[in-house]
């Protein structure tokens, strides 16, 4: 089990795709949450445009029944949208001999750790923490700045809605939802 985490625009999906592209396509199955409709409905796509065909699922529980028998690597993008339930699903896949790579944000726009992060650190064999370049000053960025009005803790968006920021340039949004 490998977890790739960090702020937005840190290269999480690019790293996930790199892992997926190392094996023959028939041995890899990518998954993405149905809520993520940004670039393509049926593919995991990086901000730079790299893509890999994906199975779209509504919940973590929908992943195991959709795994093809030839699969030796499950690549799961936007893992933070699946919540803590994904941890148990991934552990089950690993027990069945399937390697798993999960790409996920580590914190929300308020700088709060997503609930599953502590569990991931406990169960992952490898945790790769990535950073980006601050959109304001060019220093190392570990935070995600929301640029548009916030309606919920988890909101899908790209460069029109978010940008990476360093600790000094990041400002928490006015009010955090529960």
Residue spans for each PLM region:
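Structural recognition of the conserved hydrophobic beta-strand(s) that form the central parallel beta-sheet
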Residues: 75, 99-106
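Conserved ATPase-coupling elements of RecA-like P-loop NTPase cores
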Residues: 78-93, 108-114
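Short acidic/histidine-rich motifs immediately flanking catalytic phosphotransfer sites
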Residues: 69-73, 79
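Catalytic-core regions built around general acid/base machinery
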Residues: 19, 88-96, 116-123
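Conserved P-loop
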Residues: 1-66, 108-119, 132, 156-177
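Short recognition patches in nucleic-acid-associated and regulatory proteins
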Residues: 130-155
């Amino acid at each position: 089990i490998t977890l790739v985490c960090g702020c937005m625009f840190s290269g999480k999906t690019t790293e996930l795709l790199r892992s997926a592209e190392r094996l023959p396509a028939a041995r890899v199955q990518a998954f993405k949450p149905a809520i993520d409709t940004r670039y393509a409905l049926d593919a995991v796509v990086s901000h730079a445009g790299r893509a890999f065909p994906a199975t779209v699922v509504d919940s973590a529980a929908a992943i195991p029944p959709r795994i093809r028998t030839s699969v030796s690597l499950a690549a799961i993008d936007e893992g933070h949208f699946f919540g803590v339930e994904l941890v148990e699903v991934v552990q089950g896949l690993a027990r069945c001999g399937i390697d798993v790579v999960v790409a996920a944000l580590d914190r929300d726009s308020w700088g709060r750790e997503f609930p599953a992060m502590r569990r991931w650190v406990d169960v992952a064999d490898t945790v790769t923490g990535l950073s980006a370049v601050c959109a304001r000053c060019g220093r190392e960025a570990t935070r995600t700045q929301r640029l548009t009005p916030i309606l919920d803790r988890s909101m899908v968006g790209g460069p029109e809605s978010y940008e990476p920021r360093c600790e000094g340039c990041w400002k928490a949004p006015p009010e955090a939802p529960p």
